[in-house]
């Protein structure tokens, strides 16, 4: 059984923080999950916590929740904020997620890269090998095709772009970006495309961003951030830290207005900062509600190409159905070869060499024609969901 357990949409950030996973514990999580499930993929982003699994034996929904909650040491009171989808619903969920239908910013395409990373990590961890591997391969192809066909770059919108556009409209010109992961890189790229006065990039390892050092970009480590934090008029924070990185005492009470956009989950910024008159603080939930004229255009375009999602769902479900009869097909081919060998051997003992070769070709050709037709019929019935009676008849003909 294929399934996914994750945080429901529109759950408050205060709850999502309690369900966030820490990357440093990833190996431990996977090892423990594989004690209960055949395959596992963990999708852990600033806005999404989902565990995809495949189990070979029947297991109740309560057992699934218990096993997963025990691994992550989550409080049972949080179960009401989680969803569980199985089989086709789980497949549909992944295909829609990778195309941006479930993103807080509709159509935000960072999720495609995040799912690709989760898939590569699962391959590296040897935590997928069959059904989940195929499902993620088809999903990634689906996401790429959807992104190409929709041409979302023509109507860009993301938590990063919305935050920075909002700040620019408010007159911000001096920026600080905390973190240089995928979101941080997008923030820097977006800022460099506008006429801003300066950008302070705060990182733990300066060497990873050394190519950015220039006229308006200054790279500092976290120990140096407070030297300049009160000089900027906008902070974009997007680290993967499990703790607060911008504390209440870091920002002076007196001074010009400072806009802070906290894109992280768990939150990077002390929420008490919003009590200071000079601070305008928005977390990821508030950012996703900022009106953007491109949202409506993107929604219409996404609906136009939703057939790509539906086709990918069907492709995977058909693969599953064919896979179920693959062992029967192998057995039929093996039996075909055995029968052909017996007949050819019998004829070879009776005829001359040249006739024997001709007979071998004819016997093999005739056998292939009938066996291939039987296999086509078996696959066709499998796709219709009525392969059991067909398989029984074919087995009686070829395997008994």
Swiss-Prot record:
Its EC number is 1.2.1.70. Signal peptide: none annotated. Substrate binds at residues 45-48, 103, 108-110, 114. The record marks 93 as: Important for activity. It catalyses: (S)-4-amino-5-oxopentanoate + tRNA(Glu) + NADP(+) = L-glutamyl-tRNA(Glu) + NADPH + H(+). One of its GO terms (biological process) is protoporphyrinogen IX biosynthetic process from glutamate. Gene3D superfamilies: Glutamyl-tRNA reductase, N-terminal domain (3.30.460.30), NAD(P)-binding Rossmann-like Domain (3.40.50.720). Pathway: Porphyrin-containing compound metabolism; protoporphyrin-IX biosynthesis; 5-aminolevulinate from L-glutamyl-tRNA(Glu): step 1/2. The active site is at residue 46. PROSITE patterns: GLUTR (PS00747). GO terms for molecular function: glutamyl-tRNA reductase activity; NADP binding. Possesses an unusual extended V-shaped dimeric structure with each monomer consisting of three distinct domains arranged along a curved 'spinal' alpha-helix. The N-terminal catalytic domain specifically recognizes the glutamate moiety of the substrate. The second domain is the NADPH-binding domain, and the third C-terminal domain is responsible for dimerization. Catalyzes the NADPH-dependent reduction of glutamyl-tRNA(Glu) to glutamate 1-semialdehyde (GSA). Belongs to the glutamyl-tRNA reductase family. Homodimer. This is Glutamyl-tRNA reductase. The lineage of its organism: Bacteria, Bacillati, Bacillota, Clostridia, Eubacteriales.
